Regions:
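Short alpha-helical Gxxx[C/S/T] motif in the catalytic ATP-binding
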Residues: 220, 224
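Short alpha-helical segment of the dimerization/phosphotransfer core of two-component systems
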Residues: 75-82
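Glycine-rich ATP-lid/hinge loop adjacent to the conserved G-boxes
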Residues: 206-216
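Short helix-loop "hinge" at the ATP-lid/N-box region of the Bergerat-fold HATPase_c
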Residues: 162-163
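Short conserved segment of the HATPase_c
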Residues: 193-205
């Protein structure tokens, strides 16, 4: 008689129980990931919305209906933007090993950047941060075939990372051409990150020791990495303690506007 057939039923049950327990633990871990990420994605727009609505109320009480209407418009844009972000987030979590599906459109990249920076101006100001957009490369053509939601989330998370963790007073966004590609760069004049900590800042739930304004969830740069990988791009960090950070996203040129996995 083989060892398999002679094994006690209790041993089989224990093995099945262990397998089921491992499965349940994976499901719980995935659920916790989803909850943490959802909290991360909801916290940012709620803060931005509260700023816009508070200003809308103040201006309306002062009789400035035009300015109040503009504040409400910005609040509506914030809601739309973060609804798209949550959709992207759910796809990343549902298929952790898969590449995010891009839906490319031909968009005016500087215009997208300017709109996002404008929507974050109040939050930056409330933190004492000045933002600047630089696009002085004469070879940089504004129109690019890319996924606008993914690109917006990449920049949004890089900016929010600078707002929350760097202790910066100035953040600069640069657009430029590269060989067969184009680059999006976010530079701050904050506290910087030690070389030994730089690789880990891109990992899920990692919060670098340099963070000076709250622990955060450690998800923003992980989301950036996943989306940049989907674009067949790369992200690099140049920093040292006391010198600030320069995050550079390099995205290959793409001529097609198809869905891409």
């Amino acid at each position: 008689m083989s060892n398999e057939s002679s094994r006690p039923p209790q041993q089989d049950r224990r093995r099945d129980d262990a397998t089921e327990l491992a499965r349940l633990r994976r499901e719980i871990a995935l659920r916790d990931d989803v909850l943490a990420m959802a909290a991360h994605e909801l916290r940012n727009p709620l803060h931005a919305l509260s700023l816009h609505l508070a200003l809308a109320r103040t201006t309306a009480q002062g009789g400035n209906a035009v300015d109040a209407a503009e504040r409400i418009r910005r609040a509506e844009l914030t809601l739309k933007r973060y609804a798209e972000r949550v959709t992207v987030l759910m796809e990343l979590v549902a298929s952790p090993g898969a590449t995010y599906a891009l839906v490319r459109q031909r968009i005016d990249v500087p215009a997208l950047v300017a709109t996002l920076v404008d929507s974050l101006e109040q939050e930056a100001s409330s933190r004492g941060i000045a933002m600047q957009v630089v696009c002085d490369d004469p070879t940089f053509g504004p129109w690019r075939a890319t996924d606008p939601v993914a690109l917006e989330q990449v920049l949004d998370n890089l900016l929010l990372n600078a707002f929350k963790h760097s202790g910066a007073s100035r953040v600069t966004i640069r657009l430029a051409s590269a060989a067969g590609a184009w680059t999006l760069q976010v530079e701050d004049n904050g506290s910087g990150i030690a070389l030994e900590d730089q690789r880990s800042v891109f990992e899920k739930f990692a919060v670098a020791a340099h963070s000076s304004r709250g622990a955060g969830t450690g998800l923003g740069l992980w989301i950036v990495t996943r989306l940049v990988q989907a674009m067949d791009g790369e992200i690099t960090l140049r920093s040292a303690p006391g010198t600030g950070c320069i995050f550079t996203v390099r995205i290959p040129e793409a001529d097609d506007m198809s869905t891409h996995r």
